[in-house]
Design a protein with these regions (language model features):
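Short proline/glycine-enriched turn/loop segments at secondary-structure junctions
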Residues: 246, 406-409
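Active-site glycine-rich loop that binds ribose-phosphate moieties when present
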Residues: 180-186
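A short, acidic, amphipathic alpha-helical segment used as a generic capping/interface helix at domain edges
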Residues: 396-407
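M16 family metallopeptidases and their MPP-like homologs
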Residues: 20, 25-64, 73-121, 134, ...
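His/Glu-rich zincin catalytic helix
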Residues: 1-81, 85, 101-104, 114, ...
Length: 450
């Protein structure tokens, strides 16, 4: 059973309520979701609004720290109580939202919700935990140096989105992490934990009256306040091909993203371009995989993806060949991208992919938790809430002319960003000789310069 509404007696506590009932198992889940994530880092009241590095990572820092001391409990006491209840508590910060979630057996659920209520409303922000968290965040940045795929996406986003919010990493930088403090965390909490900025969601063996009771009983201290999600500006579209080589020593394999800016999720072109992108590189039998892996064995995987969110995201292809085959792989993907943009889908691709997307959609909404996550994201992004139900029919209605128009409008094969994590000395000379990169702008940056 599925319901979505804001009841009149809880509307002063939250901006929206989403419920996905499933009584097959005696498990319950309650979520509170902030309408903002790390894109808000440089706009929170009470903190420096200059756009400087000190603000990056604040949302992640402040929200994670809520988990480490709240109400009358220390971090250890929170963990001990959760263990005794067999409950799970998580806080996750993304660019577009922060998710607070508690899960437990139905018989222990209200006691578990009490802990979530303390975490959301009454964090103590202990100083010792603040310093421990700072050390952990810095250690995570050290670990990132060993994660070629993580480095690839970080540098690609920084280059593509520039100074706009999606160009800033969720967890910040070493410099910004060192500058984070408890005053900033308290200010972030005061500004963002307000009624109009929160969406409630529940899933599992729980009814709407029960959810409303929990909200009234345990979350009445959330102060009144408006939505805090400000529009996310789009970066300017740069002309010409750019090659960013993230220079890392002794790489035997290259990680490569080739992409561009894409339409907003709300744009009418988004769905036709999504259908076309999945046909191009979204399945194991797609053109990109077939040409790169099956026919030539250049990369174990080859995929293309169209992003979505509150702001304008990206379209990119991802491959990871050996170092000596980097130039050959880049040349091939560029040629395939050009062919895709100029000639569109091949015969049979559209019919196959429409059928594939309609059938596979069932797996994305298979469980109550899946549906809750999707519908929460839709509400955060101000998308139509019937999106999940109408998706198969809308995919079926995408025509060849819709796809042709979307591709003509959005695909920019001459203005692609090519980001490569590799050893520069081993790949740069061969890349510079490629005809498709003859006029490209090349830049080499150290892999640890993030």
């Amino acid at each position: 059973m599925t319901t979505t509404q804001t009841a009149s007696d809880v509307s002063t506590l939250i901006d929206g309520l989403i419920l996905e009932e499933n009584h097959d198992l005696p498990l319950c889940r309650l979520q509170l979701t902030l309408r903002v994530g790390s894109t808000s880092d440089q706009t929170a009241q009470g903190t420096a609004a200059s756009g400087g590095p000190a603000q990056m990572g604040l949302c992640n820092f402040a929200s994670e720290l809520q988990r480490r001391g709240a109400g009358s409990r220390s971090r250890a006491q929170i963990d001990e109580t959760l263990d005794g209840l067999g409950a799970g508590l998580s806080i996750v910060c993304w660019h577009d939202q922060v998710l607070y979630e508690i899960t437990s057996l139905r018989e222990h659920f209200e006691r578990a919700v009490e802990i979530l209520a303390d975490v959301v409303q009454r964090p103590t922000y202990p100083g010792d935990e603040s310093e421990r968290l700072r050390r952990e965040l810095l250690a995570n940045l050290d670990d990132l140096r060993d994660d070629d795929s993580g480095l690839l996406h970080r540098f690609f986003s920084r280059e593509l989105y520039g100074e706009t919010p999606y160009g800033r990493p969720v967890a910040g930088t070493e410099e910004s992490t060192q500058a984070l403090d408890l005053d900033g965390a308290h200010a972030w909490h005061r500004h963002h934990i307000v009624t109009g900025n929160m969406i409630a969601g529940a899933a599992g063996a729980i009814s709407q009256p029960e959810v409303e009771h929990l909200l009234r009983q345990h979350f009445a201290q959330i102060p009144a306040g408006p939505r805090r999600d400000e529009p996310i500006p789009s970066p300017p579209q740069r002309k010409g091909r750019r090659v960013l080589i993230v220079d890392k020593p002794e790489r035997t394999q290259s990680q490569i993203l080739i992409g561009q800016l894409a339409p907003h999720w709300k744009d009418p072109s988004w769905l036709p371009l999504h259908v076309s992108t999945v046909a191009f590189g979204g399945t194991f039998t797609a053109r990109l995989m077939d040409e790169v892996r099956v026919k030539r064995g250049l990369s174990y995987g080859a995929s293309a993806r169209l992003g979505n969110g509150r702001g304008q995201r990206s379209l990119y292809a991802h491959v990871f060949p050996s170092a000596e085959q980097t130039a050959e792989t880049v040349e091939l993907v560029l040629r395939l991208y050009e062919e895709w943009a100029e000639k569109g889908l091949r015969p049979g691709e559209l019919d196959f992919i429409r059928s594939y997307l309609q059938k596979s959609h069932a797996f994305t909404v298979q469980t109550a938790d899946d549906r809750l996550g999707l519908r929460t994201r839709l509400q955060v992004c101000d998308m139509p809430l019937d999106h999940e139900k109408t998706y198969p029919a809308r995919v079926a209605g995408v025509s060849a002319s819709d796809i042709e128009q979307a591709m003509k409008t959005w695909l920019l094969p001459d203005d692609l960003l090519i980001t490569i994590v590799a050893t520069a000395d081993s790949v740069l000379p061969s890349l510079q000789k490629l005809p498709g990169l003859r006029d490209a702008e090349f830049e080499v940056v150290p892999y640890d310069s993030f």
